[in-house]
């Protein structure tokens, strides 16, 4: 399925609107792989992945973007982190039961969406918007109006295809050079509402665009690959341990005999016993393939 896990950008030759189409199904499956989330949380994480991937296309520099949902409901946190290379990871944290079909409001309660853009060079930007919409799409559209004053429409779908998790979506946005030209967006949004999850999950981008916009002149650009990437490593885990006060390390070792660091994103475990800790204190470098001894 070569068209999967790709981000496509496109422009309309005669309309002041830009578009994006993404299928991130394999990446979505990888994010869910080591977790047993309720169905409603799985679906929300898929939408959040699609949304964050679409947002990475707006980055005009090397850097990261994080879209985070947090609230006082049973779903305390849902977050997706991506970068300009469309390398993605994500996780959710729950306290309490979440029924199938639960709405955004039921899951998060009184919540906010925090979008953080961190360039490798320059200042970090953070935007916060209350989760007042019925869907994640509604909340993101409100964010674009609030932060960039650009009317935007999002179409996001999650589900299964051939027994595997599937996540895909589309974005339409008025070009910044013509922010008041809402008629073009309204026209194209009406056409785009006819797209089905099955089409986005299974068809190449050019075929989807032809089915939707065959009366329009569309320029489709080269796709960008999307992939799951977790930045954890034994070395980073060792550095985190060495940042703890020595007394706290001793207490952990005395209590447990060893320290097991678990990565919520990818499910990896990094085990450090007393020999490892003593070697790290002596300046040894952790072996990425295993323990120090």
From Swiss-Prot:
Please outline how this chain is modified post-translation. Under oxidizing conditions two disulfide bonds are formed involving the reactive cysteines. Under reducing conditions zinc is bound to the reactive cysteines and the protein is inactive.
Name its cellular compartments.
Cytoplasm
Q: Which UniProt keywords apply?
A: Chaperone, Cytoplasm, Disulfide bond, Redox-active center, Zinc
Coiled-coil regions, chain positions: none
Described by its record, this protein's role is as follows: Redox regulated molecular chaperone. Protects both thermally unfolding and oxidatively damaged proteins from irreversible aggregation. Plays an important role in the bacterial defense system toward oxidative stress.
Q: Which family does it belong to?
A: Belongs to the HSP33 family.
Identification of the protein by name: 33 kDa chaperonin
């Amino acid at each position: 399925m070569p068209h999967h896990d790709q981000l496509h950008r496109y422009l309309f030759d005669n309309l002041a609107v830009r578009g994006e189409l993404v299928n991130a199904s394999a990446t979505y499956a990888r994010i869910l792989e080591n977790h047993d989330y309720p169905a409603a949380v799985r679906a929300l994480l898929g939408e959040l992945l699609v949304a964050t991937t679409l947002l990475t296309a707006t980055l005009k520099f090397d850097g990261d973007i994080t879209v985070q949902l947090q609230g006082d409901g049973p779903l305390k946190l849902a977050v997706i982190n991506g970068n300009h290379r469309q390398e993605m990871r994500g996780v959710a944290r729950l306290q309490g039961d979440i029924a199938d079909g639960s709405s955004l409001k039921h899951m998060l309660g009184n919540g906010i969406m925090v979008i953080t853009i961190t360039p490798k060079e320059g200042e970090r930007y953070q935007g916060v918007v209350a989760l007042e919409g019925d869907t994640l799409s509604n909340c993101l559209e409100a964010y674009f109006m609030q932060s960039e004053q650009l009317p935007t429409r999002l179409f996001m779908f999650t589900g299964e295809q051939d027994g595997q998790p599937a996540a895909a979506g589309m974005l339409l946005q008025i070009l910044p050079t013509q922010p008041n030209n809402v008629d073009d967006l309204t026209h194209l949004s009406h056409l785009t509402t006819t797209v089905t999850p099955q089409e986005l999950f299974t068809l190449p981008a050019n075929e989807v665009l032809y089915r939707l916009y065959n009366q329009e002149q569309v320029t489709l650009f080269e796709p960008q690959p999307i992939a799951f990437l977790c930045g954890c490593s034994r070395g980073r885990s060792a550095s985190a341990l060495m940042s703890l006060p020595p007394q706290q390390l001793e207490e952990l070792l005395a209590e447990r005999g060893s320290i097991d660091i678990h990565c919520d994103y990818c499910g990896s475990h990094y085990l450090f016993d007393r020999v490892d800790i003593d070697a790290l204190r002596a300046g040894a470098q952790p072996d990425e393939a295993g323990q120090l001894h």
